[in-house]
């Protein structure tokens, strides 16, 4: 008898093998669909006439929808790698995906009653992530998991507050909780960038991986997240606009300091380093402009926050998609052209969204934000087109998301 060759695994088996394979495409699809729906199909409104303004539904869906799926994929992939413990697979990942998907149903139409189900679903996956990281930290206390656990816990609390405000119909509380959730996500971004940037930069500087020439100053690792935490605490206690404005500027400057760390010689022009530093640049610029707005600058805070949350978080998420999508599918750097093109499209979309309101660019003809939303959607779809063959193919030994 001849030995039967191994059967090709099903698509579900491949996607369920690792968190990023399932959740990065989900995040990309949601990130492409939702802003396009809201700006062009819904015309900045919502199908249902609920208690919450459409803009709050929009912000909630971006933070806990697009970025939330990216977060689930990253945490369920990176934490096992950092702790050298088995990663969640199969049913666990699909259960998280189901919880995340249910949470998105209410956001598609802005219905208050469906919001109850969405609240339960979002709280479920948020708390599950916190419990998962805590369990791994207990099992491997020597691994540096306090910072991710701290910021994840803060995001879970902010998410519960957002959903609670939606259920109560409290617009002011919802607005405040969404802002805090976005800031907490920026703090988490600072932690992730610190973990990801070092191995990526060292791989670029020494592809043989025999040395580690890039060693950022230890004191700078938590500077940006620490100052973002100060902003969050100030927002919670309700300090004056002037005080919170100066704190925002300080946090933005700390992200700018990350950009300075990216100057590692001629390799600083590599797309991978430019992408990661651009995330810090947009985060920093947005926070600084938000702070100056609170100090009386002649523009609103909203476009500045879009630079930080749409730009800093968006480019950071897409950078991780592009880099980890190679490392965890048996490939390596440099980034393929489609990934570079997707990143360029995303930065363009962010600038088209924010700069007209800041008075830097003239308003373009057509529906407000339509072009920015279209280019934003194209960025995610271009990345997905390039990486879907990698993510949907059987697993190969790859690199990683950090040390």
Residue ranges, per PLM feature:
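Hydrophobic alpha-helical transmembrane segments of multi-pass integral membrane proteins
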Residues: 1-403
